[in-house]
């Protein structure tokens, strides 16, 4: 299975809505609003694309074998690089190679240490150590607890 990366705006809004409203996806995104409407999703897409201009890096939409699979990439969170990956459940087995691809690009993007924040509902985290991440603690965001993992630069 091959994957390709795209601007968020390359993906039709209804496909984004399907991802952002998917119950299995929402279960692992405690800050998500399952009631997205088209206008809110369009604004969100525009803001994600704007991160490339604002930060020199940002998230990208992911297609696997030409099909929209989700999104991933580096975002700014409290002045640090935070990696996020959100995939439709059918593509959850592709996460490792997608993370490895993004991590291989961090030097060209000027990124050193990278964090991953996961909700405690994510029980399977051992794979992160194989990708160079170590658990370094917990953080609270908008009243929700997240496990913090870091990969040094």
Predicted feature locations:
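Residue-level recognition of conserved beta-strand positions in structured domain cores
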Residues: 7, 85-87, 118, 151
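Conserved catalytic-core motifs of GNAT/GCN5-like acyltransferases
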Residues: 117, 134-148
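Conserved GNAT acetyl-CoA-binding A-motif
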Residues: 108-120
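Active-site beta-strand termini and strand-to-loop segments that position acidic
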Residues: 63-65, 150-153
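A short, well-structured alpha-helix characteristic of acyl/acetyltransferase catalytic modules
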Residues: 1-42, 46
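Acetyl-CoA-dependent GNAT
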Residues: 35-84, 88-90
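Conserved acetyl-CoA-binding loop-helix of GNAT-fold acetyltransferases
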Residues: 92-106, 130
